[in-house]
Curated annotation (Swiss-Prot):
It is an enzyme of class 5 (isomerase). It comes from Vesicomyosocius okutanii subsp. Calyptogena okutanii (strain HA). GO terms for cellular component: cytoplasm. Its main location: cytoplasm. InterPro entries: Chaperonin_Cpn60_CS, Cpn60/GroEL, Cpn60/GroEL/TCP-1, GroEL-like_apical_dom_sf, GROEL-like_equatorial_sf, TCP-1-like_intermed_sf. This is Chaperonin GroEL. PANTHER family: 60 KDA HEAT SHOCK PROTEIN, MITOCHONDRIAL.
Length: 547
């Protein structure tokens, strides 16, 4: 085991804070409508230009081991916020920096770190509840477009195309983002279904760029039981080989000899095939398999209805225009099922929704309905150059996640105003002791940081703007684009409640851990060991002289 370098107390916290500041200072310049770009050097190809906070954070690894630990913990804040809300990574980073900076100062002044953490946690809990109380539902097309526009750095065309996509496939419909071939953004809507099961083996992947298995006009075989013996699949594989088409197998499970043989055949190019587990469990799995069967024009091979894999014919196999299988999701685009059958199934599910008394069952039925009737919308991003294309695609991805979050939990005034308003909800909050009260005050000051940073990036005077906004009520705030004050909702400056909530919760969580850190341990870098042993000739001569 290599030797360790250990730092304690203030020295450890200050080194960690240096790392936090290095990462946060690079990320926070991107915040707001007048945020700046960051250029990322790539080991291959040209540099990437981005205003996406999580993209900047992920590129940063610091030389100093202790500083890097601090930077990596803040990177975790950005990544977790991105995973849950899909946006708000820069806001989360700014909040984390403010909390850690003030927290480390307070610990240095003699405060108890555990009590500071408890104070921050109490304030965060109350602030999150206040955000939900302040939140307004986001259901109409105009509000959805506004959320998308703000998230895409005030690009109105992005907000409009996302709102249009949601209108066409429904708010629960599947929307994907691709690189287009023209200069303008385009929207394609195709009937389709997505479910949360991916490929059973990474060896089915045939698109290395997206790490997906893309099948064009494949046959679809559905089975409601486990497949372990390859002999069961031979009739279906022979049909597929004769037609030179691909095959997607969806079954309860595929393992052992059957999976191994499919992988080998696929890698050798004998049969283009992919295998996926059937989504859901029990009776719900059977219902979803039947949905897929109706969508693709196939038949579920089930012993319950007297069908077995050994007797499969081409009539039992369905097809679709395209099927994309990722690590965790499968999208079936333009299934070959009859429209009358699909409409009948949709009406059947609607009838079940009306009669069910269970909220859980109703939610699952609504999911199935959206997948059957909603279809898939594809936003094709257009730009003049490849660098601009990548940046624009990041914007559209962020905006799409933000609009989904807005539909899910509602919206609050944007531009950092919502967090400033929640500070008032903390006015009557007190901790169990003085140090916890300091923790609550730290959280209050940190909640001002996003608004301050937005104003600073726009070249304004942060303290003046903050005081003016704090004196206002409800949705009153500052529009950094026009440098005017007014009702943020009327000006179309909205943030999804889920994004603001996730940013605050993750920033508070990681910051609490960093403030309470008392020791840091890392490996001491090893010098290169010499390849040859040193010459011992001199010692031999010395020995000879002493005889």
């Amino acid at each position: 085991m290599s030797a360790k370098d250990i730092k304690f107390g203030p020295e450890a916290r200050n080194l960690m804070l240096d790392g936090v500041n290095m990462l946060a200072n690079a990320v926070k310049v991107t915040l707001g409508p007048k945020g700046r770009n960051v250029v990322l050097d790539k080991s291959f190809g040209g540099p990437t230009i981005t205003k996406d906070g999580v993209s900047v954070a992920q590129e940063i690894t610091l030389e100093g081991k202790f500083e890097n630990m601090g930077a990596q913990m803040v990177k975790e804040v950005a990544s977790k916020t991105n995973d849950i809300a899909g946006d708000g990574t820069t806001t989360a980073t700014v909040l984390a920096q403010a909390l850690v900076t003030e927290g480390v100062k307070s610990v240095a002044a003699g405060m108890n770190p555990m009590d500071l953490k408890r104070g921050i946690d109490k304030a965060t809990e109350v602030a999150v509840n206040a955000l939900h109380d302040f939140s307004q539902p986001c259901n109409d097309t105009k509000a959805i477009a506004q959320v998308g526009t703000i998230s895409a750095n005030s690009d109105v065309s992005v907000g409009d195309i996302i709102a249009d996509a949601m209108e066409k496939v429904g708010q629960a419909g599947v929307i994907t983002v691709e690189e287009g071939s023209g200069f303008e953004n385009e929207l394609d809507v195709v009937e389709g279904m997505q479910f949360d099961r991916g490929y059973l083996s990474p060896y089915f992947v045939n698109n290395q760029d997206t790490m997906t298995a893309d099948l064009e006009s494949p046959f679809v075989l559905l089975h409601d039981a486990k497949i372990s013996n390859i002999r069961d699949l031979l009739p279906a594989l022979e049909i597929v080989q004769k037609s030179s088409k691909a095959l997607l197998i969806i079954a309860e499970d595929i393992d052992g000899e059957a999976l191994a043989t499919l992988v080998v055949n696929n890698m050798r190019g004998i049969v283009k095939v992919a295998a996926v587990k059937a989504p859901g469990f029990g009776d719900r799995r059977k219902a979803i398999l039947e949905d897929i069967a109706i969508l693709t024009g196939s038949v579920v091979i089930s012993e319950e209805v007297g069908l077995s894999l050994e007797k499969v014919t081409e009539e039992h196999l369905g097809t679709a225009k395209r099927i994309e299988i990722g690590k965790e999701n499968t999208v079936i685009v333009d299934g070959a099922g009859k429209k009358s059958n699909i409409d009948g199934r949709v009406n059947q599910i609607k009838a079940q929704i009306e009669t069910t008394t269970s909220d859980y069952d109703k939610e699952k039925l609504l999911e199935r309905l959206a997948k059957l009737s909603g279809g898939v919308a594809v936003i094709k991003v257009g730009a003049a150059t490849e660098v601009a294309m990548k940046e624009k695609k990041d914007h559209v991805d962020d905006a799409l996640h933000a609009t989904r979050a807005a539909v899910e939990e509602g919206v609050v005034p944007g531009g950092g105003v919502a967090l400033v308003r929640t500070i008032k909800a903390l006015d009557g909050l007190t901790g169990d002791n003085h140090d916890q009260n300091i923790g609550i005050d730290i959280a209050k000051r940190a909640m001002e940081a996003p608004l301050r940073q937005i104003v600073t990036n726009g070249g304004g005077e942060a303290s003046v703007v903050l005081n003016n906004v704090a004196d206002g009520k409800d949705n009153y705030g500052y529009n950094a684009t026009t440098e005017e004050y007014g009702d943020m909702l009327k000006m179309g400056i909205l943030d999804p409640t889920k994004v603001v909530r996730a940013a605050l919760q993750h920033a508070a969580s990681i910051s609490g851990l960093m403030i309470t850190t008392e020791a840091m341990i890392t490996d001491i870098p090893q010098d290169a060991t010499p390849t040859a042993s040193p010459d011992m000739g001199g010692m031999g001569g010395m020995g000879g002289g002493m005889m």
